[in-house]
């Protein structure tokens, strides 16, 4: 469904098929429906072409997996909300300059082959501010900076507080906590952002 513009370098993901809950009617909330996703991501291939190393490009398999997981778990009421969620996910990957995403429901109307929506967004146009609190009392001096660095990979950190030291809550025994907070500018929808945070938490142990 998505029509890729000719100018620039583009990654195309076509007919990614998800099965999820999307719709307003009661019957649409009872069982999953087929959801067809197309996405075109404008990037610059110069560096990855020069080095021939995947790490210098956008991992489109990872983009596909994240869009698929989001579409199958978020349970949006409208395809308009879902398509903007997916656009935000695409723009969260470093190097993506523009994205065109379409979402279609093949069985939305039996008289039409499919009915869908399309959204085009530029990098930075969907950024929102997420206020993130950090805290640890297990290897905190090492883990707190590592967590902040990992979070900076999700978006742009615009503000950071100083580090505060506090005792465990409720008078419990144990090491003191180190705490901080930061403001993160990111296009990610809330559900995808929480999943990224949980992944960082797992990686840090």
Mark where each language-model region is:
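Core catalytic alpha/beta fold that binds nucleotide/phospho-ligands
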Residues: 77, 107, 124-205
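N-terminal, polar/charged subdomain of small-to-medium soluble alpha/beta proteins
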Residues: 1-128
